[in-house]
């Protein structure tokens, strides 16, 4: 679960596109996963926490986040994932009640009985390439958890 759609996502109506989506695809591929594509099944399901991009790319307001939280909880219940990955502080704040992603990343939590791993977003990694080694550690932890399931 990401935070909000990027510009490219908003224009095309699909999540995780553009350069950050390409990096996310590489990250998933590095641990043997891929996003769903036409005719190709996948164990990966991607969704932004907020389904729209706020005007001027501003941070969503607390009322917008609070309004969407029940919808995301229901979305998660319907998708019935075995593992959740939160890629962004907004999603962490809404679902864990904690927003400092740099402190949360790398630690496992539970959300309604589902193992949950906060990770740095691919968008953040494009802005701060030095954080990629932290993301790699998180990806390896995710891979290890998925192999046990």
Segment roles from a protein language model:
Residues 1-149:
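A polyanion-binding, active-site-adjacent surface
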């Amino acid at each position: 679960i990401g935070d909000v759609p990027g510009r490219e996502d908003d224009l095309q109506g699909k999540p995780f596109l553009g350069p950050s989506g390409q990096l996310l695809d590489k990250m998933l591929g590095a641990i043997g996963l891929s996003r769903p594509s036409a005719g190709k099944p996948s164990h990966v399901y991607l969704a932004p926490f907020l389904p729209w991009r706020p005007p001027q790319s501003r941070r969503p307001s607390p009322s917008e986040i609070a309004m969407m939280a029940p919808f995301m909880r229901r979305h998660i219940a319907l998708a019935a994932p075995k593992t959740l990955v939160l890629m962004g502080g907004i999603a962490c704040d809404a679902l864990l009640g904690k927003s400092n992603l740099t402190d949360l990343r790398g630690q496992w939590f539970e959300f309604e009985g589902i193992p949950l791993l906060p990770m740095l977003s691919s968008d953040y990694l494009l802005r701060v390439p030095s954080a990629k080694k932290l993301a790699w550690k998180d990806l390896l932890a995710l891979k290890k958890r998925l192999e046990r399931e």
